[in-house]
Amino acid sequence: GKQYDLYAGALFHTEVEALEWQEAGSRWLIKTNRGDEFTAQYIGTGTGPLHVPKLPGIAGIEAFKGHSFHTSRWDYNYTGGDPKGAKMDGLANKRVGIIGTGATSVQCVPHLAKACKELYVFQRTPSSIDIRNNAPTDPEWFNEISTEGWQQRWLENFTANQTGDNTVEDLVMDGWTDLSRRVRSKIMSLPPEKMTPANMIAAFEESDFEKMEQIRARVNTIVEDNVTAEKLKAWYRQLCKRPCFHDDYLQAYNEPGTYLVDTDGQGVEKITEKGIVVAGKEYELDCIIYASGFEVGTEYKRRAGYDMVGRDGQKLSEYWADGMRTKHGVHV
């Protein structure tokens, strides 16, 4: 906030509770959970689709007597550390379980593995973990590419690579552009006379299989325990689940005291006062961390926190009762 001088025009840690159109004055009336009331001629609702935490529907979740929290509500008072990466010294003598192995967990596990006395990662389905190659930016390289308008050029190049444009250059060169270019290259290598829908699909599948075999083979080169390595291999096609890219996640399973608890696709059986049960075995824990993601597909007013009221008192939820519709729109 301070870096970009946002405090003069922003209300942080504030939730909008009501948004109502006022015919008199032709303005929107905005009410917040802090008691604010103000008006605006135009509004932009950048509430996003993924911000309401979702806890797993596991039997006994309320019975646990230890500490617990969702990853999006990280409790630094318990773990120690801070958002800048300070050591989480509050976990040095703790047995911690984390439920989930998706994109959030992949980011958390490497830090937890170094901080906890014991870390148990409860896995239903393994994520595909490709190389991220996250390294410090070379200043000389950046000076070469950061000429006026470079952000727009890179945005357009990324969009072109992701939307099927046969652009030769890949400025971004990350896992997402590689995925698109790899598939497109395989398809475009077909002779013109064999460019049929069936052959194009087969080429797509071949490209996907080759990449997933590469990702699975990488697990063996990193994870020292063979049983753990096999359980960490994504067995599905790359886009069946959100692809993940990380340089330290797989390595975390080589840390002493870090254990993968694979549930063989069944998920956690139940939660007790003392910990988590999988396949009849109870794992006693001091803390449970829920890396269980966010609500998807719930009605917009539940996730936004308000129901927009327009002309003649009509609520947006009523207007959208049969599906979303709008005359114009801007994607945020």
Predicted features by range, described:
Residues G1-E62, G66, N77, M88-N93, ...:
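N-terminal FAD-binding dinucleotide-binding subdomain shared by FAD-dependent oxidases/monooxygenases
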Residues P83-K84:
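Surface-exposed intrinsically disordered loops and tails
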Residues T104:
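Hydrophobic/small residue at the entry helix of a nucleotide-binding pocket
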Residues C108-L112:
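Aromatic pocket-lining residues of Rossmann-like dinucleotide-binding sites
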